[in-house]
């Protein structure tokens, strides 16, 4: 496979990509003027690019001269030496169709061929890209413009670098449909130009027969693009026209406080796609192709989001008969908040069992993390997604009665009893949902190691300042490790290798648990004591969570959880 062939070949960094495309029915003519840099430790005798294999490269030019090149499916070898730390500007001309077969080559065959959609009875088939007069949707997965880093590394999935590139897109389009991409758009006749103020990991192109609704709140533009005749939502939110800006502001502020990150883009877009548009949860990436910088692609009528506004309103009216009525404004605000929560939750429910969950493919919180930074480490390729997960996910370590059905978190714990994190990232048989739970456990362990020596608040403040000052950049892990040691005196090198390579977990014995109620100055406090023994050959970190619950019966009572 071509991706494997070039996986270990040194690659240049893509600094600038000025793209010009002309859609021509099922074909596309394009020109990319790119600036690349050799940040490797040695000179290179050739430059590697990737492009959809159905797009034919007609020429590669530099300073007005044609450069020799060879094509190997999606790979392009350009015979141009580049010295260490040297920057070069090249122009690549290409033309042709878009092959969807290049998409998701790392996904297991059984998942690739599975046409089921959770909680949806019908099967719609799968599409990964469109290029036609009626509809166009191109994402980085289909490599519709030249890049220097492959979208996947099948042999080592977590060893995929990320470029943050200054993109400009010019679309020459004679039709009457809406052209949508990242950045600020400028229309000059049949030429639409999109300019971005930040370096991005990738961009998309959509051309569709859309209607649009837009609202500006503070400094952010909120836009909804939906197929004509598909406005099923306005009647629920039009009564909120006066209060909606305040509701949106509150939701945005709440998300930023919860995630301790500011929304980094100037606009937020919901764009409807055909229901067949499919993507996959890949833990090494941390987000799906539904979630692009600035843009969330929503399958037709929001069918995969499980948001039926009319059914929700009927339930509210039914509940109102028992607990007091909600007026129309309260109902509409509740509908809006429920919809937003479906876009910010880590998991989506699959059936009635609360432990039977799927990774939420429409979770937009990676816009605050995965689209803004990348931590690179050849030794620990999983460190980027682990740190992002540590910052992005909420704690769910609380006490829960076990109903006799093993859940994915317990399966992850069982896996780690005899496997290392290093082994897990190469285990293609490990379900994504189990690996996600394993990733959360390992991310929590990394966080606990640090916060056993400093407060969580101090660590959160450090992380926010560290990543905000390096926004839209590739950051070497050594830089993060150095800054943590400089700021707090914590040596991650004393912990990280065992965290990554240990092939078993510690054995912890807990006994003599005793809880006492103490009244001090009319305040009731609790003192909890227990003994811990670790007879194993691996250090362990104990974290405790104290919960206060109700009375007897089968109701949830007080409890503790240990890690």
Where do the language-model regions lie?
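N-terminal, polar/Ser/Thr-rich
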Residues: 1-29, 58-59, 129, 159-161, ...
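Solvent-exposed beta-hairpin/edge-strand motifs
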Residues: 44-66, 172-176, 547-549
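A surface-exposed beta-strand-loop module
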Residues: 52-118, 154-158, 188, 247
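Beta-strand-rich binding/interaction modules
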Residues: 56-62, 180, 517-563
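Extended, low-hydrophobicity, Ser/Thr/Pro/Gly-biased non-transmembrane segments
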Residues: 94-210
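Juxtacatalytic substrate-recognition/specificity segment
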Residues: 169, 215-386
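Acidic/His/Gly-enriched intrinsically disordered linker/tail segments
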Residues: 353-449, 453, 470-471
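Amphipathic alpha-helical substructures
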Residues: 429-512
